[in-house]
Structure formats: C-alpha cells, structure tokens
Amino acid sequence: MIPIQLTVFFMIIYVLESLTIIVQSSLIVAVLGREWLQVRRLMPVDMILISLGISRFCLQWASMLNNFCSYFNLNYVLCNLTITWEFFNILTFWLNSLLTVFYCIKVSSFTHHIFLWLRWRILRLFPWILLGSLMITCVTIIPSAIGNYIQIQLLTMEHLPRNSTVTDKLEKFHQYQFQAHTVALVIPFILFLASTILLMASLTKQIQHHSTGHCNPSMKAHFTALRSLAVLFIVFTSYFLTILITIIGTLFDKRCWLWVWEAFVYAFILMHSTSLMLSSPTLKRILKGKC
C-alpha cells in the first residue's frame, strides 16, 4: 500500500501526461488537416500521422476514463470502455508499424528487385493499406468484444448460484481474450522491428559508403536519421513492453499501484508522441513558419 499523497501525485502526473498527448495529437490533426484542405494532397507519412493523431486522441481519452473507472470500481462502465481502449491501442500499434515500414521503403538503399517492387506497390496503394490496417484492427478486436460480453455476464452472475462448468468455460474464454490481444500487438511489433532493423542496416551501410574522413552534409543527415531511429526504437520497444505488462496485469495490485504504473507507461507514450511530431517535415515546416 502506498501513501495517499503519493497516489494523488502520480495521478496528477498521469493526467498532465495524458492532456499533453491529447494536445499534441490535436495539433498534428489540425495542422496537417489544414494543409490537406489547402493543397488537396498529403504525403503518405502525413496521412499516417493524421491517422495516428486521431487514434491516439481517442486512445488517450479512453485510457483516462478507463483508469478512473477501474480505480473507483465502476465495473459495468469499465467493461464498455475497455473495448474502446483495446481497439484504438491495436490501431495505434499498426499505424506506428506502417510509419516505420514507409520510412524503410522510402529511405533504404536496397536494390533487390523484390524490394523495389514492394516499394512501388506500397507507395502506390498506401491509402488502401491504411484502410486495411483499420479492417485488421476490427477483426482482431472481435475476441475482446466477446470477452467483454463474457465479463459482463460474469459480473451479473456474482450474486447468483453458479454453474461451475459454465463459469469455468467463461473464465477460460476470458483468458483467451488476453492472449488474442497480445498476439494482435505482437504482429505489428514484429513488423516494426523488421523494418527498423532493415532501415538501420541501410543507413549504416550508406554512412560507411560515404565516409571520406570528414563530415559532409549527407553523412550528417544519415547520422541524424540513425540517431532518431535509435531513439524511436528504444521508446517504442519500451512502450510495447509496458503495454504488454499492463495487459497481463499480474505483477501489481491494480488499485494500489495503478497511478504509479500508468504515469510510468504514459511517460514513454509521451516521448513517442513527441518524436512522431518531429518526424514530419511538413509539420515542422508549418510550425516554424508560425513562429
């Protein structure tokens, strides 16, 4: 049990982190959305960032409501909010992975014919790939939706005589829900890892190829990109691991350590959100023009 003062402190930290992420997401959507209306077209990276901004905006509000309902034991409301949080969480993972895939195919210097064909196809069909990630999320959330319905049934049966066989089956399916959610996050994370490793290998190769004993502008750009990619890799991997531990949820007394853990988790998410804002040339150009 931690002191109430410490609980309130971490609760405030979590709320401030959440509000900052919401403001960042709103800014991304507003700035890039306005650019979209003005020029009638956006680069694929900006399409992903707008989608990520919308997804993370909804995810953060769902997270705040979900955590407060969990803390105050509003179980029936919590079941309905959990499915919303899971949907936008999975969608956010897929969009982050697609962003890394885009950078990989755009920046990498691989010349294999299969890679060149993939680059042409992916860039050509990018809006459909975004739609596909939404459809995949809808499909992968089905076990969680069924699991939430089962959770509501279990809550309803708490004060009634139980059929142990039925209850055991319901609880086993509820455990399967968490396994399905974990798999739904692992697949885009593996895609992220593969794209990141390929991109880092390509950038390292380009740096070695252009190395002439002094730092020319091309090498500086490659070093900057490699450093940014390493930071993104560390932050996103930490984000994945903390979310995975949150889903498993067996390491902590949720009510006691909820706000400490959430403040820790969303510190990584805030860093990741900030790094995404800095990854868009369009966004940086517009914001610099406003200053």
UniProtKB/Swiss-Prot annotation:
- State one Pfam family annotation: TAS2R
> What membrane topology is given?
Multi-pass membrane protein
Q: What is this protein called?
A: Taste receptor type 2 member 16
Q: Where are the Extracellular topological domains?
A: 1, 63-84, 147-182, 250-257
Q: Establish whether keyword Membrane is in the entry.
A: yes
According to its UniProt entry, the protein's GO biological process terms are: detection of chemical stimulus involved in sensory perception of bitter taste
Q: Which residues are glycosylated?
A: 80, 163
- List the keywords (alphabetical): Cell membrane, G-protein coupled receptor, Glycoprotein, Membrane, Receptor, Sensory transduction, Taste, Transducer, Transmembrane, Transmembrane helix
Q: Does the keyword Cell membrane apply?
A: yes
Quaternary structure note: Interacts with RTP3 and RTP4.
